[in-house]
Amino acid sequence: EIQKNIQSMEQASNEIGAQIQAIQAQQAAAAAAAAAANQGSGGAGYNGAYVPANGVLTFPVPSYYGVTSEYGWRGDPFSGGQSFHMGIDLGASMGAPVLAAGDGRIILQEYHWSYGNYVVIDHGNGLSTVYAHMSAFTKPFGSVVKAGEQIGAIGTTGASTGPHLHFEVRVNGQHTQPRGYLGM
């Protein structure tokens, strides 16, 4: 039973990664088609090429009180076994603002049994960020957002042990250690 729960959570993360890759591929194809059609006619909005200043993203929870769970192997709080934690958990008060870590577009916004209420922002160049367990969304799906703009509120939805933000950085849909991207 424990191993089954761990495998189910890992499968959920892999499914989200595959969704991110598929959406990014669709967006790249649409952008290429639009660029070919417009041939440099300009325009406003998100250009799909966000590069954080000095390689550091905006911290998504300014009022956090600490990292409550690290990226990597850990004792799973639900199964009691070992599982790989695909992001970092930033403890904060219920309802505290969750901010976009960089300029981009909200490409996923839904409820998942494990991630709870979660958002994925595509920052372009294969970089995306995941914000999970939120109590509320403050921007609609498809919104273009700027770094530091509020996208949600701290919560404890899904498989959560208390109010926090589960934050992931994904490169081409694959999870990676987020600390370096946050300047931690």
Say what each PLM segment does.
Residues Y50-M184:
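Catalytic cores of peptidoglycan-degrading enzymes
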